[in-house]
């Protein structure tokens, strides 16, 4: 992970990782200013923006993450195993299930916890239909992933699911 100023200067490495650590879906933890990210499929972590100190929020299979505005809760989907949408307390790591998405979460890449290598793409090319390319097969078609988000007032969440065979947007109330 790196950060850089808007004008392109001041590039600095915040955290360097190898292919054995799958660091993904970095975003700001609401208004806290800290950075939250997943070490998929092992943990949800937060980095202090100023000191770079890293704390594990939860040893859990969080995948696509969406913090609330205050940075107190993190909405996430899950994969391998798919346990539906979860809300994780950023302070305690406690979680509660919102719903099951029944998304197919396609993509051979997600069956292991390291980045795709050239040989993965070469192998994927051997089994493609005329509608697919290696990126879809190795990394997984994005339209099959839930990618949850909060409503403006944070009383509902939206997510995608291809449970019917066609990707559609669903809304789940949190009340």
What is each model feature region?
Residues 1-175:
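Sequence signature of WD/YWTD-type beta-propeller architectures
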